[in-house]
Amino acid sequence: MNYQKELLIEAIQEDNLKEVQKLLQAGVNPNTLDEYGKLCIRSAINNENLDIVKVLLDYGADPNAIDKIKDPIILEAIRSRELGIINSLLKKGANPNVLDRHENPIILSALPRGVNIVNTLLNNGADPNQVDKNGNTALSIILERTGDINVDVTALLIEKVKEKALNLRNSNGETCLHLAAQQGKIQMFDKYLDYYQTVNITDKAGNTPLYWSKLLGHTEISDMLNKRAEELNETAYTKITKTERFEDLPPRPKIALSYNLEIGGRYANEEKTKLIYQGGDVEYIDFRAIVPESANTEKKINEEVINEAKQKAKELLAGKDALVIPGNNREVDKEVAKHFGGEVNIKTGQPDFARSLAEMVMAEVAIEKGMPIMGICGGHQIINTYLKVPILKEK
């Protein structure tokens, strides 16, 4: 690399606009690569320096050049949410349909970065029906990301390919309306409910949007669906199977989930959401109500203690159809395991005697009642220990 090219790279890195202009006027190549094989304009984009990007483009920087990074430089601007830089690159001929190094359209990277960026790409020729290497369009990817649905971005994509988009389904057979009902996105119903000639659109499980709005307590959406059903002179159902139609929510299995509000637990919260989405009627069962925390001080375990705990567990699990024991950062107490004929020889965290005893007793009651049990992480240890499967550290 010659000295002037080094000076250009240094000036860009230091946001020295005047020096950049001076060097470009002197004939330094605006497509200069740095010592790592990266285009110098990439540094200007990383620095979010619109003025330097514009100068480089005006002096001939190629907006479609590919360097050692292999990703198009416009992708750098998209990831940085730099709308001004994106516009400048597109104005100079950047390809809005270019693929990244993983063979995915760049519009896919724009989806989580806001409606303005997606709109800019679409207005400059980005194809909303362009597919990635797995055959997914931007809208179908949004449908698969059921954790959230960006109303503005989704609506923008729908407007580009309206009829096809509104009938698009994800792998669960869900339409935009199903996802909007799940997440309480009233704006989607305001915009598009009237397009559908029935409210009884079913997914693969036979669930309609009304099922999800009722299940998750989105009453305003439920009201909108019922009103639309009246306009269409039809009955709104929550679930349609080959043999039955349900106007209200169908019977749901009652699931007990071991939990304590003060201790909390990420797995418990996540699992409750997942179970509700699978149609479960989930109720937290406080393991501290079975064996109080004070037991951690005494650590007393005998038949009297066990029987008292079992009686409380039976009361709390009465009427339940299944038990879920989620994980936490506490290991099964060795003395509790020993009492139930198990063996624990690991060291992953501090044991919780009271919780171990409470959940071991819950597992015993559930097994005696013939209830299915699911264990997650530490919950696996509880079940395995009760079943006398040794939990040993790796050799």
From Swiss-Prot:
Give UniProt keywords alphabetically: ANK repeat, Glutamine amidotransferase, Repeat
Domain of life where this protein originates: Bacteria
Keyword field contains Membrane: no
A single Gene Ontology MF term assigned here is: hydrolase activity
Which parts of the chain are ANK repeats? 3-32, 36-65, 69-98, 101-130, 134-166, 172-201, 205-234
Q: InterPro entries attached here?
A: Ankyrin_rpt, Ankyrin_rpt-contain_sf, Class_I_gatase-like, Multifunctional_ANK_Repeat, Peptidase_C26
Active-site residue numbers: C377
Q: Which residues form the Glutamine amidotransferase type-1 domain?
A: 272-395
Kindly provide the name given to this protein in its UniProt entry.
Putative ankyrin repeat protein RF_0950
Q: Which organism is it from?
A: Rickettsia felis (strain ATCC VR-1525 / URRWXCal2) (Rickettsia azadi)
Q: What's the source species' lineage?
A: Bacteria, Pseudomonadati, Pseudomonadota, Alphaproteobacteria, Rickettsiales
